Amino acid sequence: QQDYTGAHFDF
């Protein structure tokens, strides 16, 4: 999962 919201990196 790639949630590039600001500085959110959830792989």
UniProtKB/Swiss-Prot annotation:
Lineage: Eukaryota, Metazoa, Chordata, Craniata, Vertebrata
Keyword Mitochondrion in annotation: no
Residue numbers carrying Pyrrolidone carboxylic acid: Q1
An example Gene Ontology biological process: regulation of blood pressure
Source organism of the structure: Ranoidea citropa
UniProt name for this protein: Caerulein-2.2/2.2Y4
Subcellular compartments: Secreted
Keywords: Amidation, Amphibian defense peptide, Hypotensive agent, Pyrrolidone carboxylic acid, Secreted, Sulfation
Positions where Sulfotyrosine occurs in the chain: Y4
The keyword Secreted is assigned to this record: yes
Phenylalanine amide PTM sites in chain numbering: F11
Similarity annotation: Belongs to the gastrin/cholecystokinin family.
A Gene Ontology cellular-component term: extracellular region
Tissues in which the protein is found: Expressed by the skin dorsal glands.
Function text: Hypotensive neuropeptide.
Chief localization: secreted
PTM summary: Isoform 2.2Y4 differs from isoform 2.2 in not being sulfated.
Origin: domain of life: Eukaryota
